[in-house]
Amino acid sequence: MVNGRIPSVFSKTYVTPRRPYEKARLDQELKIIGEYGLRNKREVWRVKYALAKIRKAARELLTLDEKDEKRLFQGNALLRRLVRIGVLDESRMKLDYVLGLKIEDFLERRLQTQVFKLGLAKSIHHARVLIRQRHIRVRKQVVNIPSFVVRLDSQKHIDFSLKSPFGGGRPGRVKRKNLKKNQGGGGGAAEEEED
């Protein structure tokens, strides 16, 4: 770090499909994008790549002997990590179950999906907008990344930000305008719907 710049990461976080126009895969990806409110195919490929790396590690460990030190140490670390993010159930803490994981298991743990499932947003797309506009916090930290992976222990701490109009902060522009009109004008005009 000679010039004070933070070095960038050069490894890709996704892998493009080998066959670009495979109808079954294209349909499946489009269905996933619609269901989880993703922006593009790259978001699907990124999760697919992360899952592939995890499954590859599990397959490698399964080839070793059950009493092998490496298998015990790395296998337990992998399983604990998957349980912590809520992808794997505690009752299924075996490497065999890691091979059965699907993309949907990881997409369910995204902040965008969790905000929608908790009922903080009207739709999965609304959830993405709320997150990007900094209305959502996890514990005390405002998170504005829809792909943020929510840990199991953080799930119950997802809420509206304290500064957000939804969370009791300063009212939004339209609401302030209506309040000002009601105080000053004396109310000849009908009130706009407040959300």
Curated annotation (Swiss-Prot):
It comes from Drosophila melanogaster. Belongs to the universal ribosomal protein uS4 family. The keyword Ribonucleoprotein applies. It comes from the Eukaryota. InterPro entries: Ribosomal_uS4 (IPR022801), Ribosomal_uS4_CS (IPR018079), Ribosomal_uS4_euk/arc (IPR005710), Ribosomal_uS4_N (IPR001912), S4_RNA-bd (IPR002942), S4_RNA-bd_sf (IPR036986). The keyword Transcription regulation does not apply. This is Small ribosomal subunit protein uS4. Signal peptide: none annotated. Component of the small ribosomal subunit. Identified in a IGF2BP1-dependent mRNP granule complex containing untranslated mRNAs. Part of the small subunit (SSU) processome, composed of more than 70 proteins and the RNA chaperone small nucleolar RNA (snoRNA) U3. The gene is RpS9. Residues 109-183 form the S4 RNA-binding domain. Gene3D superfamilies: RNA-binding S4 domain.
